[in-house]
């Protein structure tokens, strides 16, 4: 990325990420939920956040629809705008990790290269890619917004899975079968991964 601003320097905080993590009692990380529209990314992200909140973790969900009401309101759905959308979200997610927070990002993010760029923004291990695996058929059946129908009729151009490709992760940290398993099973799978990684502490039996 080429910076358009000159004569700017990065100011280091006297309160470090480690300080904030110690205060919070858990590590910070990016949970990146990716998958087709209707795969259950946002629903799963909020369910995982609810579980983490009950464990007294500091969290925040960045949702693909919500972000387009503000930070990315100027972007459309062309390939170029999708790239910029994910770039902005990646930078925001990185700031959340510096704040000691577990950030849950729920975006279609259809292109591997864009997801890889976010991974490269943060130290190794800080980007946890969660592939919400559901078939196109299942996603269309769940389509309460009618987006797939509009996409197939040509009303919505560049729609992922119909007129624009989705590139599944090749080596995601977690694969959740949101097209087959229950929401509770998928959420527990994510929580157990975080506990095994030492990001959050195991709950008492």
Curated annotation (Swiss-Prot):
InterPro entries: APS_kinase, P-loop_NTPase. The keyword Glycoprotein does not apply. Keywords: ATP-binding, Kinase, Nucleotide-binding, Phosphoprotein, Transferase. ATP binds at residues 35-42. It catalyses: adenosine 5'-phosphosulfate + ATP = 3'-phosphoadenylyl sulfate + ADP + H(+). It comes from the Bacteria. The active site is at residue 109. One of its GO terms (biological process) is hydrogen sulfide biosynthetic process. Its EC number is 2.7.1.25. Pfam families: APS_kinase. It is an enzyme of class 2 (transferase). Pathway: Sulfur metabolism; hydrogen sulfide biosynthesis; sulfite from sulfate: step 2/3. GO terms for molecular function: adenylylsulfate kinase activity; ATP binding. Catalyzes the synthesis of activated sulfate. Belongs to the APS kinase family. NCBIfam families: apsK, PRK03846.1. This is Adenylyl-sulfate kinase. It comes from Acaryochloris marina (strain MBIC 11017).
